[in-house]
Amino acid sequence: MRRVRVGDEVIVTAGRSKGKQGKILRILGDERVIVQDVNMVKRHTRPNPTANKPGGIIEREASIHISNVMLYNPATEKGDRIGFRRLEDGRKVRYFKSNDEIIDV
């Protein structure tokens, strides 16, 4: 079970986009994530008439290392550490370490 999942609201803790928050769009391998509207880069693309794609400068999200994001806790309005816990019915769930609130229901 991962500490962060696709769709989680995260806050960036290091790098050029420090302090920004957004949803996780994709997880690449074990170490990198793509966060919505964070770490934007400009990609210069050549037109491809066979694929009917125009050329130009496209702005899109680049990946950042998973250690540079923290799950956003709406109760404290900050990034928070995550722990794992087993419930009485045997399910393994994530919880915020600051206020013991369960994330996965």
From Swiss-Prot:
One GO molecular-function entry: rRNA binding
Transmembrane segments: none
InterPro entries named among the record's database cross-references: KOW, Rib_uL2_dom2, Ribosomal_uL24, Ribosomal_uL24_KOW, Translation_prot_SH3-like_sf
An annotated GO BP: translation
GO cellular component, one term: ribosome
Superkingdom per UniProt: Bacteria
Keywords: Ribonucleoprotein, Ribosomal protein, RNA-binding, rRNA-binding
Gene3D superfamilies according to UniProt: 2.30.30.30
Pfam family, one: ribosomal_L24
NCBIfam families: rplX_bact (TIGR01079)
PANTHER family linked: MITOCHONDRIAL RIBOSOMAL PROTEIN L24
Function of the protein: One of two assembly initiator proteins, it binds directly to the 5'-end of the 23S rRNA, where it nucleates assembly of the 50S subunit.
Family, per entry: Belongs to the universal ribosomal protein uL24 family.
Record's protein name: Large ribosomal subunit protein uL24
Organism of origin: Nitrosococcus oceani (strain ATCC 19707 / BCRC 17464 / JCM 30415 / NCIMB 11848 / C-107)
